[in-house]
């Protein structure tokens, strides 16, 4: 699926399970169970040990299914590239990282850039992010989003 197809799929499905586990083996089982349970998009966070191996294994096992595997908590371009090469179809960052946006664009993958201030949101957009994820939004609530 190309980048526009991935974006449309994410927008159409509107459900992403963010998964974490205490080990890579557990993580693979969680990803498979979530996908087999009908969740169309699964985000594997880089905070879990063995996340890259999990992405690679899950991407191969679920190839051809409706499940879309992405990666979250991406902090640098090297991790972004490694995750894409392992099979991640989309990238999520908790912070604004211009090198991550550039790497995702180089590989034709959608990127959700973490941003908090209006300046960060605009900077992410101008750098080519596909989505700005206001993070951490829970500390300011919906009125902040409305004001922006």
Where in this protein do the model-derived segments appear?
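Conserved anion-binding
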Residues: 50, 65-66, 75-78, 84-148
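Conserved N-terminal beta1-alpha1 strand-loop-helix module at the mouth
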Residues: 1-86, 106
């Amino acid at each position: 699926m190309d980048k526009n197809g991935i974006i449309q799929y994410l927008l159409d499905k509107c459900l992403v399970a963010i998964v974490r586990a205490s080990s890579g083996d557990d993580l693979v089982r969680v990803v498979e169970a979530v996908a087999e349970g009908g969740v169309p998009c699964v985000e594997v966070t880089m905070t879990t040990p063995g996340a890259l191996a999990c992405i690679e294994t899950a991407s191969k096992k679920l190839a051809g299914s409706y499940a879309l595997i992405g990666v979250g908590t991406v902090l640098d371009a090297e991790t972004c590239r490694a995750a894409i090469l392992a099979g991640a179809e989309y990238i999520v960052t908790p912070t604004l990282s211009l090198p991550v946006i550039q790497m995702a664009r180089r590989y034709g993958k959608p990127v959700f850039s973490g941003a908090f201030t209006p300046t960060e949101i605009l900077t992410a957009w101008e750098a080519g992010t596909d989505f700005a994820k206001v993070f951490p939004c829970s500390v300011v609530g919906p009125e902040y989003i409305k004001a922006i």
